[in-house]
């Protein structure tokens, strides 16, 4: 949620879900993204914020510098190609990450490299607003590479997954 016009000395938005930001520098008016789990303060940068749940919440920095904080932990300052995420106890953890999936997300693609099938299907289910049910639990942790356009239909993504010949995905309903 963000206003049509920012007022006062801060530019504040509230986020549930995921968003990519390309923020113009303005030292006198910091840009702040607030989620249920943390607050990100920037002066001018490119970054991605994901806030779906406590265990699926992180800030990934593409360019510039941001500070991430919450009530449970000291603030973390991120450099490009770093990510702040929440631990199970609500603390913040910083780690180096590959930013390519976030660039592709911004360009309209799902991009998974060495990602477990369960994570891929969770993301597809969220995007297409469908429930995903696994009948073969043995494949949940199978790691794979998969790329698909977010503008294509769910059927298109399913056909591409099935073309890999490793497992079979069906659509019901």
Question: Which residues does each predicted region cover?
Answer:
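A residue-level detector for the "anchor" residue at the start of short, highly conserved motifs
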Residues: 1-173
């Amino acid at each position: 949620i963000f206003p049509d016009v920012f007022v006062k000395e801060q530019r504040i938005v509230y986020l549930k879900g995921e968003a990519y930001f390309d923020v113009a520098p303005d030292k006198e008016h910091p840009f702040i993204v607030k989620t249920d789990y943390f607050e990100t303060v920037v002066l001018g940068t490119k970054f991605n914020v994901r806030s779906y749940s406590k265990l699926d919440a992180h800030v990934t920095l593409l360019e510039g510098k941001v500070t991430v904080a919450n009530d449970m932990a000291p603030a973390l300052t991120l450099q490009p190609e770093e990510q702040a995420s929440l631990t199970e106890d609500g603390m913040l953890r910083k780690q180096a990450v590959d930013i390519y999936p976030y660039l592709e997300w911004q360009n309209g693609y799902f991009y998974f490299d060495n990602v477990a099938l369960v994570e891929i299907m969770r993301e597809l289910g969220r995007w297409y607003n469908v429930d995903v049910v696994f009948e073969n639990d043995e494949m949940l942790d199978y790691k794979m590479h998969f790329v698909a356009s977010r503008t294509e239909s769910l059927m298109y993504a399913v056909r591409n997954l099935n073309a890999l010949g490793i497992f079979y995905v069906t659509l019901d309903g």
